[in-house]
Amino acid sequence: MSINDKPIGFFDSGVGGISVLKEAFKLLPKEDFLYYGDSKNAPYGTKKVEEVKALTFNATDFLMSKGIKALVVACNTATSVTINDLRENYDIPIIGIEPALKPAVELKKGGKIIIMATPMTLAEKKFANLMDLYKETEDIEPLPCPGLPELIEQGIVSGDVIYNYLKDKFSKYDNEKISSIVLGCTHYPFIEETLKEVTHNKACIIDGSFGTSRELKRQLKNSNMLTEENRVGKVTIFNSREDKDIIDLSYKLFNMK
């Protein structure tokens, strides 16, 4: 098999990275994708750094054994902790994801920018460096959201539980003064509709899925690694939990409008 026809690997701590996979498949509909969700060990956002690194390397080795031509680390926490180490150890294009703060700043709406993310993403140096770029000019507030990925891993993406969680998190803010909400975890796009409801649709909601997918396409194109086949690509999903329910949930989220 030529490198062009090899699949693209996607990895996340659970089902969250499927939000990025959806965007990538729209952008690259002829490509085959292999997705590995580590739901057995989710969430990563509250684990120790060394544990996240070990789990990320295990997942990458699994996907490499399947013959992938590129890897998307569709997990903010794993990206912030491990991306440099991965690039040093594997000789394929590796694309990470980080909170889409730049697009939020470029909107220039003048209000508060809230960054929802896991505690570990917000604690890492990579995030501190990102904040340093804008902290002098922007009103930016990190909002740690522990427990939210776990709910989404259970397939709870709407209803009273999610509404009440978000209502509690945003109770300290004046919705009129929020310009943008940056979704700094790939699980969060699945609760976007409820987030709009809680904030009365006042803020722009931004996630990094499109930017990451566009970067994937750019790197593959520049390396002449895009498939040359004129066909519809396919998506195959694996999960460390190895039970039918999590695979069914994964495909359900992938097909969610």
UniProtKB/Swiss-Prot annotation:
Keywords in alphabetical order: Cell shape, Cell wall biogenesis/degradation, Isomerase, Peptidoglycan synthesis
InterPro entries in the record: Asp/Glu/hydantoin_racemase, Asp/Glu_race, Asp/Glu_racemase_AS_1, Asp/Glu_racemase_AS_2, Glu_race
Residues reported in the UniProt entry to bind substrate: 12-13, 44-45, 76-77, 186-187
Catalytic activity: L-glutamate = D-glutamate
Keyword Zinc among UniProt keywords: no
Enzyme Commission code: 5.1.1.3
GO terms, biological process: cell wall organization; peptidoglycan biosynthetic process; regulation of cell shape
Function summary: Provides the (R)-glutamate required for cell wall biosynthesis.
Listed name of the protein: Glutamate racemase
Organism: Clostridium botulinum (strain Hall / ATCC 3502 / NCTC 13319 / Type A)
Gene that this sequence comes from: murI
